[in-house]
C-alpha cells in the first residue's frame, strides 16, 4: 500500500485589531494540529471610513481633524495573496492550482467548497462562487444583482457583485 501526503496551506486574513490575538490563539493551541508552516497570517491594511452614500470621510467625533479608519475588508484578500507572495509561493512550492475562500460569516458554505472546486475543474472555470441565503438585516455581505432604476423606460443592464451589508437596505 502506498501513501501520499499533500500540503494543504491555510491563509488567515487578520486586521490590526485581531492579528496578535489570532497568532496567540494558534500558538496556544499548537496550530490546531496543522504544521506551523501550513498557516500564513496576512495582515490587512486600514482604510478611511466613509460616512455616507456620497463618500464623505468619517471623522472622529472627538477630533474633527482625525479620519476614522477600518480594516480594508474581505476584498483585500486577493491583493494580500499577491503582495505577500503567498499565492506565488503556494503555486511554486506546493503545486497549488486552486484557492478556496470562505469567510467567518459564511462558514456553512465550507462543506460545499470541494464540490465547487470539482465543478470549476471539470468545466474549466477560472472562478466559481458559492453563496448561501441571507436574511434582511443580517450584518453580513451578500452577492446581489444591482439593477439601476428605470428612468427612461429602457432595459437597464445589471451587475452581480459582492455588496457589503451596510450598503443594502433591509
Stretches found by the model and what they are:
Residues 1-170:
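Domain-scale recognition of functional cores that engage charged ligands
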Amino acid at each position: 500500500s502506498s501513501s501520499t501526503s499533500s500540503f494543504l496551506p491555510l491563509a488567515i486574513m487578520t486586521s490590526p485589531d485581531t492579528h496578535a490575538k489570532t497568532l496567540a490563539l494558534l500558538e496556544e493551541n499548537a496550530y490546531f494540529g496543522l504544521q506551523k508552516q501550513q498557516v500564513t497570517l496576512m495582515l490587512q491594511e486600514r482604510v478611511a471610513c466613509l460616512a455616507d452614500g456620497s463618500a464623505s470621510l468619517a471623522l472622529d467625533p472627538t477630533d474633527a481633524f482625525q479620519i476614522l479608519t477600518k480594516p480594508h475588508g474581505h476584498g483585500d484578500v486577493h491583493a494580500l495573496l499577491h503582495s505577500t507572495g503567498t499565492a506565488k509561493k503556494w503555486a511554486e512550492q506546493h503545486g497549488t492550482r486552486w484557492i478556496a475562500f470562505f469567510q467567518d460569516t459564511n462558514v456553512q458554505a465550507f462543506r460545499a467548497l470541494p464540490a465547487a472546486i470539482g465543478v470549476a475543474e471539470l468545466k474549466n472555470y477560472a472562478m466559481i462562487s458559492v453563496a448561501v441565503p441571507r436574511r434582511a438585516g443580517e450584518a453580513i455581505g451578500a452577492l446581489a444583482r444591482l439593477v439601476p432604476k428605470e428612468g427612461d423606460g429602457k432595459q437597464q443592464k445589471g451587475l452581480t457583485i459582492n455588496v457589503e451589508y451596510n450598503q443594502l437596505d433591509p
